[in-house]
Swiss-Prot record:
It comes from the Bacteria. Catalyzes the activation of medium/long-chain fatty acids as acyl-coenzyme A (acyl-CoA), which are then transferred to the multifunctional polyketide synthase (PKS) type III for further chain extension. Catalyzes the ATP-dependent CoA thioesterification of the sterol 3-oxocholest-4-en-26-oate to yield 3-oxocholest-4-en-26-oyl-CoA. NCBIfam families: PRK07798.1. This is Medium/long-chain-fatty-acid--CoA/3-oxocholest-4-en-26-oate--CoA ligase. It comes from Mycobacterium marinum (strain ATCC BAA-535 / M). The keyword Ligase applies. GO terms for molecular function: ATP binding; long-chain fatty acid-CoA ligase activity; medium-chain fatty acid-CoA ligase activity. The keyword Nucleotide-binding applies. GO terms for biological process: cholesterol metabolic process; fatty acid biosynthetic process. Residues 525-550 are annotated as: Disordered. ATP binds at T178, G179, G180, T181, T182, G183, F184, P185, K186, D419, R434, K525. InterPro entries: AMP-bd_C (IPR025110), AMP-bd_C_sf (IPR045851), AMP-binding_CS (IPR020845), AMP-dep_synth/lig_dom (IPR000873), ANL_N_sf (IPR042099), ATP-dep_AMP-bd_enzyme (IPR050237). Belongs to the ATP-dependent AMP-binding enzyme family.
Length: 550
């Protein structure tokens, strides 16, 4: 008997509806829904046979490839909880994550074997290890690792998990570990039903209404040809997990690639006739734009939607993409691991605004003032984004942070991760940025994303982050850490004159550091700790003499 709104059930409804349809494509490999089911069932049975219990944690330490989706589905079919592992983590971070998540099993790519070998002695609960071949020759047998397909080959391909006491529920837990901008990663715990509703396609984004029946998406899949969807951020990011599960539940075809290569993205869109491209802000959009400006001979006639989420997407880049790709829809959405989808905007030519994204929020997202009241449209009051309704249970093993982020105000429980915004007169919301990285200069609160967007509009700036640095007069002033385009080195005076047309004078950077590359997460998230370290490690390359003391 199917249990409504469990992720495994929702996937199986689509598998039953379109078994022979291609579910996944990666390079020259592809898998139908029936093949995905068979391999995921084998993995689930193998994990159960290895002693992985209901609710146990299984790590996924892989780039985007077919095996990571097999593993995602197989882990959930086994009644376990998948743990996303950032493949850029060093050994100390891996040890923390393995330990904090109570991980008992791990699926990892072979290239990470040395790191895994060094971490396992300190994390003895990780006993079952499956290794995905990736062309590397690292030794994984020294710690008992077993090749992925060899391990599952003799396991049952049957869908008989209820008989194995792996009952499913809408209350089963799904965990997203956040990279965050400060501190160690935290595991955000969601009920399956809640994360399905706000992140995995259980709401009609056009109407804001819930999908009524658990079979509706599968029925629609059987009645319509598939869309070809291409999420390019790594699967460690909630945005790509969201795009992938939405594709699976609705019987679409998902294209994956282990590495982000802008030229290859456009070739893949052309070769695979991709319809929808998903990415995370400027860190991906700018290289994509540069590649397209260099070579615009790709056949992109199939592509009709470019969707960015969860990272700064600068107006200047939106405008140029619209110029090069006319008659496409470009969307810019807000959301987080703690809230799911929060709102979106559709960008048209000439409509890109300065500052943070201006979005239409969904009816479960509000902006609250300091007293916990909803901010009135056009009031000019800065408030904080809050989400009600289907929100997480809390952070795994962190009651203090749970109490700080998930609050009950006037009898309503909200998720409040710390993003500030203003409500415009027409009811749309302009995002200002995360409060934890805001800069206080002379009593004025400055949000980095607005300044970064202005800087990145300059033709000589490839990427930039801004942070606050000590100032004897103002307490802090805005400092820019800039990666210029090759052969360029814009002065602070040039940047000052350029950005003043987009932002107020008190927000303009007063000191400047040049770097070869701005450090970001694999999904393009800014690393403000790293940026702050750059300003502390050496003197600025340029300062505004009128505003910064020598």
């Amino acid at each position: 008997m199917a249990v409504a709104l469990n992720i495994a059930d929702l996937a199986e409804h689509a598998i039953d509806a379109v078994p022979d349809r291609v579910a996944l494509i990666c390079g020259d490999e592809q898998l139908t829904y029936a093949q995905l089911e068979e391999k995921a069932n084998r993995l689930a049975h193998h994990l159960i046979d290895q002693g992985v219990g209901k609710g146990d944690k299984v790590g996924l330490y892989c780039r985007n490839r077919i095996e990571i989706v097999i593993a995602m589905l197989g882990i959930i079919k086994a009644g376990a909880i998948l743990i996303n592992v950032n493949f850029r983590y060093v050994e100390g971070e891996l040890k923390y994550l393995f330990d904090n998540s109570d991980m008992v099993a791990l699926v990892h790519e072979r290239q990470y074997a040395d790191r895994v070998a060094n971490v396992l002695p300190d994390t003895p609960n990780v006993k079952t290890i499956l290794v995905v071949q990736d062309g590397s020759d690292k030794d994984y047998r020294r710690y008992g690792g077993v090749e992925f397909y060899s391990a599952i080959a003799d396991s049952s391909p049957e869908r008989d998990f209820a008989e194995l006491q792996r009952e499913r529920s809408a209350d089963d837990i799904y965990i997203l570990y956040t990279g965050g901008t400060t501190g160690f990663p935290k595991g955000v715990m969601w009920r399956h039903e809640d994360i399905y509703r706000v992140l995995f396609g259980g709401t009609d984004f056009a109407t804001g209404e819930f999908i009524k029946d658990e079979y509706d998406l599968a029925k629609a899949a059987a009645a319509n040809p598939p869309m070809i969807r291409y999420p390019i951020p790594p699967m460690i990011h909630g945005a790509t997990q969201s795009a992938t599960w939405m594709s699976i539940f609705s019987g679409q075809t998902t294209v994956l690639a282990p590495e982000f290569d802008a030229d290859q993205v456009w070739r893949t869109i052309s070769d695979r006739k991709v319809n929808l491209l998903f990415f995370t802000g400027d860190a991906m959009a700018r290289p994509l734009l540069d590649a397209l400006m260099k070579d615009n001979d790709y056949d992109l006639s199939s592509l009709f939607l470019l969707a960015s989420t969860a990272a700064l997407f600068s107006p200047s880049i939106k405008e140029k993409l619209l110029e090069l790709l006319p008659n496409r829809v470009i969307t810019d959405s807000i959301g987080s691991s703690e809230t799911g989808f929060g709102g979106t905007s559709i960008v048209g030519a000439g409509q890109a605004t300065t500052g943070g994204p201006r979005v239409t929020i969904d009816h479960r997202t509000v902006v609250l003032d300091e007293e916990g009241n909803e901010v009135k449209p056009g009031s000019g009051v800065r408030g904080i984004i809050a989400k009600k309704g289907n929100i997480p249970v809390g952070y795994y093993k962190d009651e203090k942070k749970t109490a700080e982020t998930f609050k009950t105000i006037n009898g309503v429980r909200y998720a409040i991760p710390g993003d500030y915004a203003m409500v415009e007169a027409d009811g749309t919301v302009t995002m200002l940025g995360r409060g934890s990285v805001s800069i206080n200069s002379g009593g004025e609160k400055i949000y980095p994303e607005e300044v970064e967007a202005a800087l990145k509009g300059h033709p000589d700036v490839f990427d930039a982050l801004v942070v606050g640095v000590p100032d004897p007069r103002y307490g802090q002033h805005v400092a820019a850490v800039v990666a210029p385009r090759p052969g360029s080195r814009p002065s602070l005076a040039e940047l000052d004159g350029f950005v003043r047309s987009a932002i107020a004078g008190y927000k303009v950077p007063r000191s400047l550091w040049f770097v070869d590359e701005v450090k970001r997460s694999p999904a393009g998230k800014p690393d403000y700790r790293w940026a702050k370290e750059q300003t502390e490690a050496r003197p600025a390359d340029d300062v505004h003499a009128a505003h910064v003391s020598a």
